[in-house]
Amino acid sequence: MKNVNLISSSSQKKGRIYYQITKKYRKTKINLSFCKGFRYLFPKKNYFYFIKNYDKMKLTRIFVPIVASLVLYSCASNNLSYEGKAFKSAYESIKADELKKNLMVIASDEMEGRETGSEGQKKAGVYMIDYYKNLGVSYPKALGSYYQKVPKEALKSRRGELPDSENILAFIEGTEKPEEIIVISAHYDHVGTNNGVVYNGADDDGSGTVAVMEIAEAFQQAKKAGKGPKRSILFLHVTGEEHGLLGSKYYSENPVFDLKNTVANLNIDMIGRSDKENEGKNYVYVIGSDMLSTELKKINVAANKATQNLELNYKYDDPN
């Protein structure tokens, strides 16, 4: 499989994150992103509707293909079936009630809408780190902690100055190719408060945040069972997305791992509910898989077919 390198973040369109990647010496804009809907603001009245109807949305079914895809991505194509079976018990450990429990905290009023650099966002970060500690999932040794500080100088926003913030990183080392890194990411910031109203960000991107956390738990369970990932996995929670992908940009320019060893990034954003045109469907928008590599698209399709058979919607899968 050819190597694909993440080198910098560039632009935003309808909730998607774009990353500049280089494949040998050819540059193109790309991201493999899983999205479900594109509404940004999620005030309290919608937050309670979201929680009330959570079970109906079957969120756990969205995450399973992502998990399976990553495992299969670590394997030779002729061994996809075996590895899928080996990981089945781990990905089945992802439960809707666990996702809901974490989301109720991440998107609670106590977190004050998780504005970049705010005390509420920092509280959310502490909760996430405690979660990883309880799982036994550590941070990258080279970093020395779960925090990658993002200084205010790197958080220049058109909306005004922002204080220092942090990306949060957790890490599971691979068994056969530990030097090669797969990144699973989501942004954990939101838009804060406005006129005393908390914009909880349950969907944007509380849903992606708790997905990454639960995926980490599944991989850790697989590792304990002797079926850990062959490549290393970095669970990356970025800050400053709402102000222009600033945390993603900072990590791209200050990577913890050499970018030439980063073989893929799967980003998860707003997978908590459907949009109007897809109401009632079990679907997910997939963005960038074929542009990134034909192998990644084939693996994603095969993993989905073998697990939950979601509708893979490529409506927003374009290079511009």
Task: Outline where the language-model segments fall.
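N-terminal capping segment at the start of a domain
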Residues: 82-88, 92-123, 135, 139-141, ...
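Second-shell loop/turn segments in exported
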Residues: 84-93, 109-119, 155-158, 196-205, ...
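Cationic, amphipathic, low-complexity segments that mediate targeting or membrane/lipid association
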Residues: 1-51
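Structural recognition of the beta-strand scaffold that forms the well-ordered cores
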Residues: 104-107, 169, 181-185, 234-237, ...
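A non-catalytic alpha/beta surface segment that caps or lines the substrate-entry region
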Residues: 114-172
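Alpha-helical metal-binding/catalytic segments enriched in His/Glu/Asp
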Residues: 168, 184-243
